[in-house]
Amino acid sequence: MPSLRRLLPFLAAGSAALASQDTFQGKCTGFADKINLPNVRVNFVNYVPGGTNLSLPDNPTSCGTTSQVVSEDVCRIAMAVATSNSSEITLEAWLPQNYTGRFLSTGNGGLSGCIQYYDLAYTSGLGFATVGANSGHNGTSGEPFYHHPEVLEDFVHRSVHTGVVVGKQLTKLFYEEGFKKSYYLGCSTGGRQGFKSVQKYPNDFDGVVAGAPAFNMINLMSWSAHFYSITGPVGSDTYLSPDLWNITHKEILRQCDGIDGAEDGIIEDPSLCSPVLEAIICKPGQNTTECLTGKQAHTVREIFSPLYGVNGTLLYPRMQPGSEVMASSIMYNGQPFQYSADWYRYVVYENPNWDATKFSVRDAAVALKQNPFNLQTWDADISSFRKAGGKVLTYHGLMDQLISSENSKLYYARVAETMNVPPEELDEFYRFFQISGMAHCSGGDGAYGIGNQLVTYNDANPENNVLMAMVQWVEKGIAPETIRGAKFTNGTGSAVEYTRKHCRYPRRNVYKGPGNYTDENAWQCV
């Protein structure tokens, strides 16, 4: 039996941990009485122990989340914050016991008013004092924008900024040391919100991680809407079934997979891929379930073409080849894209009965002229953010089935041209990484595990985690040259099959050998 003297250090450590937990819990329980901020109504303050599977009964059904596992002890604060006389945001702050002195805001997705609880859990678990809001409305529909410009303004820019202002005040109030640096993490609409902060609120964040950004958003809505005019409805002679999209994908890989030097099912640089589809056009007498008709081949060519406006100006770049299988069930499914339909019905034309099947580029011109509250988020002069010392890191999956990765390249070029700076100077504050094999924000056939979300988490090493890479860049001045991604053997959370270092744009990955394509050292950024 061990002596009492030997046990004393362990007993003392255990007692200290329990005391710390009790102190944190007590501090959280009494925190509501200390909150007295303008326009803020506290709904509740709860202590949530690590390991809790938190029930979310008030989360809108369309948001799809009924519970969230919380990894670390947090103080959860739920609030309503007025943004005008007729609008408010629902805001949550998760303040962790393992606080690292860092503040972080999360974003949203689509047109949705859904707090992304998985991001709150992920980032608070890493020690960030984290906030997340519903962007001023509840659910995934665009209907709340109908005749409510204040709600729309919340969605465009005010929700995230308001959450940052309130969240920073709460962080200073709860932790004696306040916060030393502030960060942003978001993807899709969350990526657009990140760039809106860079463009409009340059002092809100020291570091912004903005994935697959939905900037150029008015034209994105039009681009998404125009696919129906190309495919037609299910059963039309221009429509491709999912099986035919699989056949098309195999042909695209046959033509383009080896361009990067390795035939691994991943196209490292889709901009080099211009598939010629004559090879799979049906021969006389051939079963049309195994090949494309001439009209179907034309459909594919149109999908892989940019969208131009009524005067011939570029509105939105092409969809990148390689994404077609995943996109076929969402963008090319023979139905108008729902977000686009909502946008035109409830905002552009303020007519819930507007027929989305009749969309044309003339509608795109009407929408772009409106651009309410500058939803476009396409301003290319981000010099104020640079002067404030901010860093922005953006990434985009090259299998993205919802937002073309070409659009992120287009914005990068716009910034370089507008600010008159070459890539090596942009690198000082703005870095862009193309993630081969990544679909929209997560998933895909390649090494998409970069730590941008809980579902893509591998570890917290800055080389393997895009958020912690940003922290290292901001706090230590070590900028990331590559972002290592993990390919999981059986989807998220499974073992790592292989890793690949994704290159900083404008470099691209090329297989040099001599190892297998699963060897990250067999690839080189050129």
From Swiss-Prot:
GO CC list: extracellular region
First and last residue of the signal peptide: 1-19
Active site positions: S188 (acyl-ester intermediate), D400 (charge relay system), H440 (charge relay system)
Binding positions (Ca(2+)): D257, D260, A262, D264, I266
Keywords (A to Z) from UniProt: Calcium, Carbohydrate metabolism, Disulfide bond, Glycoprotein, Hydrolase, Metal-binding, Polysaccharide degradation, Secreted, Serine esterase, Signal, Xylan degradation
Keyword Calcium found: yes
UniProt GO MF annotations: feruloyl esterase activity; metal ion binding
Alphabetized SUPFAM superfamilies for the sequence: alpha/beta-Hydrolases (SSF53474)
Disulfide partners: C28-C75, C63-C114, C187-C441, C256-C273, C282-C291, C503-C525
Subcellular location: Secreted
EC number in record: 3.1.1.73
InterPro entries xrefs: AB_hydrolase_fold, Tannase/feruloyl_esterase
Main subcellular location of this protein, as a coarse class: secreted
Superkingdom as given in the UniProt entry: Eukaryota
RNA-binding keyword on record: no
Catalysed reaction equations from the record: feruloyl-polysaccharide + H2O = ferulate + polysaccharide
Family: Belongs to the tannase family.
Role played: Involved in degradation of plant cell walls. Hydrolyzes the feruloyl-arabinose ester bond in arabinoxylans as well as the feruloyl-galactose and feruloyl-arabinose ester bonds in pectin.
Name used for this protein in its record: Probable feruloyl esterase B-2
Gene that encodes it: faeB-2
